[in-house]
Amino acid sequence: MILRNDIKDLPQGIDAAERDVFYQDSDYLLREIFIREKGKGNALNEGIRLARNDLVCVLDADCILQEDALSKAVKHFQNDEVAAVGGRLLVKREDSCQLEAIQFCEYMKTFQLSRRIFARLNAQCLISGAFGVFRKSTLLGMNGYDIDTVGEDMELVLRLQEQDYRQSKKQIVYDPTAVCYTGVPHSIKRLLHQRDRWQRGLMDCLIKHHNLIANPHYGLLGLVTMCYQLVVELLGPVFWVIYTVLLIDKNMFPLFSVVFAGYALVQIGLTIFAAYIDIEKNKWSLLKWMPKLILTTLEEMVLQIPIMVVRVVGMITFHWRRLVW
């Protein structure tokens, strides 16, 4: 099933109903359904409701699955305790521009390090909306995605985790071998707009599920994952902006330069370590790409300055721009 959301002009011959079956091919079991400007959450919920099988795959329109991604994700559901499986996102290299390369390194660190760590702790708070597989019964039992947020993917997983701790424990699995290639912004403007939305979605989810933060009742999810999301992901941009402003002070410049150099070394180390985990060839391949990895990481750090500013602005304007996509 293919869902198209926010379509303003339907093809000729399609009536203006809120939900329309535009294309159906029985040979491939494909149905294409248009949802008229109701938001991503509504479109996903309609797809879940109309799905005919026990498992539902959520996939963004700009994503391409690796040939064996679905089979690798689905095998986990042989275990009845598994409620959802998230795959690994890789950047789809289209234009080979430097901005794309920077995001490639960023995604590599995110999915090869932090997602793996949280999965090992059984304390995941997010299955990316770009690619995830769920039991239909689980989604229906939770009334689907929350339509009152732009962070619907994170909110769903937090609600699932909270529900599982209250009732029977279900597993949320991260499979790094189930690979999905996703498109990324090719301009600074679009990238900043994306990160602004992500920040508002994160803030919304932490407000809605504030009871999980530092709550030992929810195990490592509350004590580690949620604290990390609050301190590093939500408040981190505030600290970064303050740090950047303090760099202007000549008296503070030497100290903060040392801190920046240390931070740069840590980031370079994380990038190389993530690449080492990711590499499928021999160690010489890693050595060959190491100069480019180091350069790209340094460029990523420079790019973080406007990104952090935009994220702080997103937090400041949260109350009147909460649902702006």
Give the ranges of each region predicted by the language model.
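Short mixed-charge
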Residues: 2-28
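Long helical/loop segments within the catalytic core of UDP-sugar-dependent glycosyltransferases
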Residues: 18-28, 36, 41-43, 53, ...
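Short aromatic/hydrophobic "clamp" motif used to bind/position activated sugar donors
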Residues: 56
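Active-site acidic Asp-centered loop
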Residues: 59-61
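Conserved glycosyltransferase catalytic-site signature
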Residues: 63, 130, 150-157
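Catalytic donor/gating beta->alpha subdomain of glycosyltransferases that bind UDP-sugars
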Residues: 77-115, 147-150, 157-228, 306, ...
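Membrane-interface alpha-helices
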Residues: 177, 315-325
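Membrane-embedded multi-pass helical conduit in multi-pass membrane proteins
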Residues: 228-319
